Regions:
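Electropositive, gly/pro-rich neighborhoods at or near active sites that engage anionic ligands
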Residues: 1-95, 212-235
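Alpha-helix C-terminal capping/helix-to-coil transition sites in glycosyltransferase folds
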Residues: 66, 148-149
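A short, gly/pro- and small-residue-rich
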Residues: 160-181
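Long, charge-dense
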Residues: 89-140
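Short, acidic/turn-prone active-site loops that include or flank metal/cofactor-
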Residues: 102-104, 178-181, 196-198
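Active-site glycine-rich loop that binds ribose-phosphate moieties when present
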Residues: 130-148, 154-161
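C-terminal functional extensions of proteins
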Residues: 183-235
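Gly/Ser/Thr-rich loops at beta-strand to alpha-helix junctions
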Residues: 74-84, 103-107, 158-161
Length: 235
Protein backbone atom coordinates (compact mmCIF):
# COMPACT_ATOMS: atom_id res chain seq x y z
CA UNK A 1 0.00 0.00 0.00
CA UNK A 2 1.28 3.45 -0.97
CA UNK A 3 0.71 5.77 1.98
CA UNK A 4 -0.26 9.36 1.15
CA UNK A 5 1.71 12.16 2.85
CA UNK A 6 0.22 12.89 6.29
CA UNK A 7 0.28 16.63 5.65
CA UNK A 8 -2.01 16.26 2.64
CA UNK A 9 -5.30 18.12 3.31
CA UNK A 10 -7.27 15.03 2.28
CA UNK A 11 -5.04 12.44 3.90
CA UNK A 12 -7.86 10.32 5.35
CA UNK A 13 -9.71 10.17 2.05
CA UNK A 14 -6.59 9.19 0.12
CA UNK A 15 -5.73 6.57 2.74
CA UNK A 16 -9.20 5.04 2.38
CA UNK A 17 -8.70 4.74 -1.38
CA UNK A 18 -5.34 3.04 -0.87
CA UNK A 19 -6.87 0.57 1.59
CA UNK A 20 -9.53 -0.42 -0.92
CA UNK A 21 -7.04 -0.83 -3.76
CA UNK A 22 -4.69 -2.85 -1.54
CA UNK A 23 -7.54 -5.21 -0.68
CA UNK A 24 -8.48 -5.78 -4.32
CA UNK A 25 -8.47 -9.55 -3.80
CA UNK A 26 -11.49 -9.27 -1.48
CA UNK A 27 -13.06 -5.94 -2.52
CA UNK A 28 -15.36 -6.16 -5.55
CA UNK A 29 -14.60 -3.71 -8.35
CA UNK A 30 -18.16 -2.48 -8.02
CA UNK A 31 -17.30 -1.54 -4.44
CA UNK A 32 -14.78 1.00 -5.69
CA UNK A 33 -17.51 2.73 -7.68
CA UNK A 34 -19.79 2.78 -4.64
CA UNK A 35 -17.02 4.27 -2.52
CA UNK A 36 -16.46 7.09 -5.00
CA UNK A 37 -20.15 7.91 -4.98
CA UNK A 38 -20.06 8.07 -1.18
CA UNK A 39 -17.06 10.41 -1.26
CA UNK A 40 -19.06 12.86 -3.36
CA UNK A 41 -21.76 13.02 -0.69
CA UNK A 42 -19.15 13.40 2.03
CA UNK A 43 -17.93 16.54 0.25
CA UNK A 44 -21.48 17.89 0.53
CA UNK A 45 -21.46 17.12 4.26
CA UNK A 46 -18.19 18.98 4.69
CA UNK A 47 -16.46 15.71 5.60
CA UNK A 48 -17.76 15.98 9.15
CA UNK A 49 -20.38 14.32 11.33
CA UNK A 50 -23.48 16.53 11.25
CA UNK A 51 -25.98 16.89 14.09
CA UNK A 52 -28.67 14.68 12.46
CA UNK A 53 -26.07 11.92 12.08
CA UNK A 54 -25.23 12.20 15.79
CA UNK A 55 -28.92 11.68 16.60
CA UNK A 56 -28.98 8.59 14.38
CA UNK A 57 -25.83 7.23 16.04
CA UNK A 58 -27.45 7.65 19.47
CA UNK A 59 -30.60 5.89 18.23
CA UNK A 60 -28.45 3.07 16.85
CA UNK A 61 -26.67 2.84 20.20
CA UNK A 62 -29.99 2.34 21.99
CA UNK A 63 -31.19 -0.26 19.48
CA UNK A 64 -27.99 -2.32 19.60
CA UNK A 65 -27.74 -2.13 23.39
CA UNK A 66 -31.33 -3.38 23.75
CA UNK A 67 -30.98 -6.18 21.19
CA UNK A 68 -30.96 -9.84 22.18
CA UNK A 69 -28.92 -10.97 19.17
CA UNK A 70 -27.34 -8.01 17.37
CA UNK A 71 -25.28 -8.73 14.26
CA UNK A 72 -22.89 -6.53 12.28
CA UNK A 73 -23.05 -7.46 8.59
CA UNK A 74 -19.81 -6.64 6.77
CA UNK A 75 -18.80 -6.62 3.11
CA UNK A 76 -15.46 -6.10 1.39
CA UNK A 77 -15.47 -2.31 1.63
CA UNK A 78 -16.35 -2.36 5.33
CA UNK A 79 -13.60 -4.82 6.26
CA UNK A 80 -10.97 -3.12 4.09
CA UNK A 81 -11.76 0.31 5.53
CA UNK A 82 -12.75 -0.40 9.11
CA UNK A 83 -11.89 -3.89 10.36
CA UNK A 84 -10.51 -2.57 13.66
CA UNK A 85 -13.47 -0.24 14.19
CA UNK A 86 -15.87 -3.14 13.58
CA UNK A 87 -13.90 -5.29 16.03
CA UNK A 88 -14.16 -2.57 18.68
CA UNK A 89 -17.90 -2.21 18.13
CA UNK A 90 -18.34 -5.98 18.41
CA UNK A 91 -16.33 -5.97 21.63
CA UNK A 92 -18.32 -3.23 23.38
CA UNK A 93 -21.75 -4.34 22.13
CA UNK A 94 -21.45 -8.13 22.11
CA UNK A 95 -22.66 -8.15 18.51
CA UNK A 96 -21.61 -10.98 16.22
CA UNK A 97 -19.94 -10.17 12.92
CA UNK A 98 -21.01 -11.88 9.70
CA UNK A 99 -19.49 -11.55 6.24
CA UNK A 100 -22.40 -11.08 3.84
CA UNK A 101 -21.68 -10.23 0.22
CA UNK A 102 -23.58 -9.06 -2.86
CA UNK A 103 -20.86 -10.47 -5.15
CA UNK A 104 -20.23 -13.62 -3.13
CA UNK A 105 -17.46 -16.13 -3.81
CA UNK A 106 -15.91 -18.64 -1.38
CA UNK A 107 -12.53 -16.97 -1.88
CA UNK A 108 -13.81 -13.51 -0.94
CA UNK A 109 -15.68 -14.78 2.12
CA UNK A 110 -12.60 -16.69 3.29
CA UNK A 111 -10.33 -13.71 2.71
CA UNK A 112 -12.60 -11.35 4.65
CA UNK A 113 -13.04 -13.72 7.60
CA UNK A 114 -9.25 -14.03 7.71
CA UNK A 115 -8.91 -10.24 7.79
CA UNK A 116 -11.38 -10.05 10.68
CA UNK A 117 -9.53 -12.83 12.51
CA UNK A 118 -6.37 -10.71 12.37
CA UNK A 119 -8.15 -8.05 14.46
CA UNK A 120 -9.46 -10.59 16.95
CA UNK A 121 -12.91 -11.38 15.54
CA UNK A 122 -14.14 -14.82 14.51
CA UNK A 123 -16.58 -13.72 11.83
CA UNK A 124 -19.43 -15.87 10.59
CA UNK A 125 -20.08 -16.36 6.91
CA UNK A 126 -18.08 -19.28 5.57
CA UNK A 127 -20.61 -21.91 6.67
CA UNK A 128 -23.78 -20.20 5.50
CA UNK A 129 -26.76 -22.46 6.24
CA UNK A 130 -29.70 -20.10 5.85
CA UNK A 131 -31.27 -17.84 3.22
CA UNK A 132 -32.63 -14.30 3.23
CA UNK A 133 -36.11 -14.55 1.66
CA UNK A 134 -36.70 -12.46 -1.43
CA UNK A 135 -33.12 -12.52 -2.68
CA UNK A 136 -31.78 -14.72 -5.46
CA UNK A 137 -28.64 -16.83 -5.90
CA UNK A 138 -25.50 -16.51 -3.80
CA UNK A 139 -26.32 -13.17 -2.21
CA UNK A 140 -29.26 -14.69 -0.32
CA UNK A 141 -26.95 -16.84 1.80
CA UNK A 142 -26.51 -16.10 5.50
CA UNK A 143 -25.85 -17.91 8.78
CA UNK A 144 -28.72 -19.11 10.97
CA UNK A 145 -26.86 -18.19 14.16
CA UNK A 146 -25.98 -14.78 12.72
CA UNK A 147 -28.18 -12.70 10.43
CA UNK A 148 -30.77 -15.48 10.24
CA UNK A 149 -31.66 -15.20 13.94
CA UNK A 150 -30.68 -11.57 14.56
CA UNK A 151 -33.22 -9.12 15.91
CA UNK A 152 -31.08 -6.06 15.11
CA UNK A 153 -28.72 -5.92 12.12
CA UNK A 154 -26.19 -3.18 11.41
CA UNK A 155 -25.53 -3.21 7.66
CA UNK A 156 -23.01 -0.51 6.69
CA UNK A 157 -22.66 0.28 2.97
CA UNK A 158 -25.49 -2.10 2.05
CA UNK A 159 -27.43 -2.40 -1.20
CA UNK A 160 -31.09 -1.42 -1.20
CA UNK A 161 -32.78 -4.71 -2.01
CA UNK A 162 -30.95 -6.63 0.71
CA UNK A 163 -31.74 -3.91 3.22
CA UNK A 164 -35.40 -4.16 2.23
CA UNK A 165 -35.29 -7.96 2.49
CA UNK A 166 -33.94 -7.75 6.05
CA UNK A 167 -36.69 -5.29 6.99
CA UNK A 168 -39.26 -7.68 5.50
CA UNK A 169 -37.85 -10.45 7.71
CA UNK A 170 -38.93 -8.37 10.71
CA UNK A 171 -35.45 -7.31 11.74
CA UNK A 172 -34.58 -3.82 12.97
CA UNK A 173 -32.13 -2.55 10.38
CA UNK A 174 -29.48 0.10 11.01
CA UNK A 175 -27.38 1.28 8.10
CA UNK A 176 -24.47 3.64 7.49
CA UNK A 177 -24.84 5.38 4.13
CA UNK A 178 -23.47 8.73 2.95
CA UNK A 179 -26.28 9.07 0.41
CA UNK A 180 -29.48 10.13 2.23
CA UNK A 181 -31.48 9.54 -0.97
CA UNK A 182 -30.45 5.92 -1.55
CA UNK A 183 -32.93 3.05 -1.30
CA UNK A 184 -30.93 1.71 1.60
CA UNK A 185 -31.12 4.99 3.51
CA UNK A 186 -34.84 5.31 2.83
CA UNK A 187 -35.63 1.69 3.75
CA UNK A 188 -33.67 1.19 6.98
CA UNK A 189 -35.18 1.92 10.39
CA UNK A 190 -32.13 3.96 11.42
CA UNK A 191 -29.84 5.57 8.84
CA UNK A 192 -26.53 7.09 9.90
CA UNK A 193 -25.55 9.50 7.12
CA UNK A 194 -21.85 9.66 7.87
CA UNK A 195 -18.50 8.28 6.77
CA UNK A 196 -17.87 4.76 8.06
CA UNK A 197 -14.59 5.26 9.92
CA UNK A 198 -15.84 8.53 11.41
CA UNK A 199 -19.06 7.20 12.93
CA UNK A 200 -18.14 3.68 14.08
CA UNK A 201 -15.88 4.92 16.91
CA UNK A 202 -18.68 7.25 18.03
CA UNK A 203 -21.17 4.39 18.00
CA UNK A 204 -18.83 2.25 20.11
CA UNK A 205 -18.29 5.14 22.52
CA UNK A 206 -22.02 5.81 22.91
CA UNK A 207 -22.77 2.13 23.57
CA UNK A 208 -19.95 1.90 26.11
CA UNK A 209 -21.10 5.08 27.89
CA UNK A 210 -24.80 4.23 27.71
CA UNK A 211 -25.66 7.22 25.54
CA UNK A 212 -28.79 6.61 23.52
CA UNK A 213 -31.93 8.07 21.99
CA UNK A 214 -35.27 6.27 22.12
CA UNK A 215 -37.43 8.84 20.30
CA UNK A 216 -36.18 8.77 16.72
CA UNK A 217 -37.82 9.46 13.36
CA UNK A 218 -35.68 8.26 10.46
CA UNK A 219 -37.60 10.17 7.78
CA UNK A 220 -37.19 13.40 9.72
CA UNK A 221 -33.51 12.68 10.28
CA UNK A 222 -32.93 12.18 6.55
CA UNK A 223 -34.85 15.37 5.83
CA UNK A 224 -32.68 17.21 8.36
CA UNK A 225 -29.54 15.90 6.63
CA UNK A 226 -30.77 17.23 3.28
CA UNK A 227 -31.53 20.60 4.89
CA UNK A 228 -28.03 20.63 6.37
CA UNK A 229 -26.49 19.97 2.95
CA UNK A 230 -28.66 22.63 1.30
CA UNK A 231 -27.69 25.21 3.91
CA UNK A 232 -24.00 24.42 3.47
CA UNK A 233 -24.24 24.82 -0.30
CA UNK A 234 -26.19 28.07 -0.13
CA UNK A 235 -24.08 29.71 2.59
Amino acid sequence: MVLPPKDHPRYKSLLAREKLVSASNVVAKQGLIAHGRGEAFDYLLGEQTCFPALSAIKAASSAIAAAKNPVISVNGNVVALAAREVARLSEVSGAKVEVNLFHRTPERVSGLTTMMKKVGIKALGEDADDLIPGLSSERAKCCSDGIGSADVVLVPLEDGDRCEALVNMGKKVITIDLNPLSRTAQTAHITIVDELTRCLPLLSEFIKDGKGLSDFDNKKCLSDVLKYIAERISS
